[in-house]
Amino acid sequence: MIFEEFAKSDCYGMIFTFMWAFNQQSDWDYVEHIKDIFRPYGTEFYYVELMASQEVRLQRNATENRLRHKASKRDVELSNQRLLQDDAKFRLESHPGEIPFANYLRLANTHLSPQPAAAKIREARGRSLIPYPDPTGEAAHPL
């Protein structure tokens, strides 16, 4: 698996995206599984939850860049149907305070293009981190 190989490497930083169904224990377990792969290497994790309205997500679903880079989105009608079905079936936005992990940012990006959203993430990443309680026992800091 790519995560295991990357964890062992000397490479700096990995970004991956994941549509997290917060009402599915299997998704919480998957996140813990990924953390378990990297934990022996002392990896620092940063979590960014991007939130956009359904209308905007449907618009973004058909952009040239997305269609070029994501084969699964090229059948726009099918992709839009999946988006609507997933929205009806899963809770895809966390509740405030629900994410107990260190270095977490919840970013509403309905009105942000990718560049300003990335700038906000970089800005949050660069802030001094202030500890807060973490029920998992790990060091916890908000972004």
Which sequence ranges carry the predicted segments?
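Glycine-rich phosphate-binding loop used to anchor ATP phosphates in small-molecule kinases
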Residues: 1-49, 54
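Short, amphipathic alpha-helical "lid/cap" segments that border enzyme active or binding sites
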Residues: 3, 114-122
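Switch/connector loops and helix/strand junctions flanking conserved nucleotide-binding motifs
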Residues: 54-61
